[in-house]
Amino acid sequence: MLAKRIIPCLDVRNGQVVKGVQFRNHEIIGDIVPLAARYAEEGADELVFYDITASSDGRTVDKSWVERVAEVIDIPFCVAGGIKTIADAEQIFTFGADKISINSPALADPDLISRLADRFGVQAIVVGIDSWFEQETGKYWVNQYTGDESRTRQTNWQLLDWVKEVQKRGAGEIVLNMMNQDGVRNGYDLTQLKLVRDVCKVPLIASGGAGEMVHFRDAFIEANVDGALAASVFHKQIINIGELKEYLAREGVEVRR
């Protein structure tokens, strides 16, 4: 069985790591490189960096820090933010990233997924999906341009349809960002994860809602996700990654230690 992955997520804006709640009201956490180094040292399996306003600003990810991160960590890392072309992706890989993640640009141009997968291999292409649960209708909708709350918009894609579509086009992994849970720290949305898991044949990463160690356990054991991504519990040192892995191992979850 493949080991489950623990993945700290670093949202980047103006060259600094920030964190919001439900994708709003972002506060500054600190500098990118020291945080990345700390997480690698603590035992993270992978890091994900989102340049959160790149797509809504109509630009590509700020590459100045990608190379600096590659110099200080020896674990895989993934970079996202406004990647719209093969050339954009090529630059990020050249600076040392192991994977790229696309989200809003894939919604604008779904064929981008296939072009990137054909060029770099499916294993290097992650699709991020920002889902919002609409309580009145009981439906899960895919949102776009979520890095800037004034420009966030709901698309016409329902979640499960988009999950199927991106796999068809060559997504090698899916990160499901559950916006209702984001930064609230009351647990991942297991109902949503199970629905997605049923139609998702590629690695699935849960994102949004981790507040306690048991939340990671539940995502792995109950929803059978491949990785769990979290931000505020790591940034605010509520959970130590090494201790989390010891706890998960005791609970019967296969983790790298």
Swiss-Prot record:
GO terms for molecular function: imidazoleglycerol-phosphate synthase activity; lyase activity. One of its GO terms (biological process) is L-histidine biosynthetic process. It catalyses: 5-[(5-phospho-1-deoxy-D-ribulos-1-ylimino)methylamino]-1-(5-phospho-beta-D-ribosyl)imidazole-4-carboxamide + L-glutamine = D-erythro-1-(imidazol-4-yl)glycerol 3-phosphate + 5-amino-1-(5-phospho-beta-D-ribosyl)imidazole-4-carboxamide + L-glutamate + H(+). Its EC number is 4.3.2.10. Its main location: cytoplasm. GO terms for cellular component: cytoplasm. It comes from the Bacteria. The active site is at D11, D130. It holds the Pfam family His_biosynth. HAMAP family: HisF (MF_01013). Heterodimer of HisH and HisF. Belongs to the HisA/HisF family. This is Imidazole glycerol phosphate synthase subunit HisF.
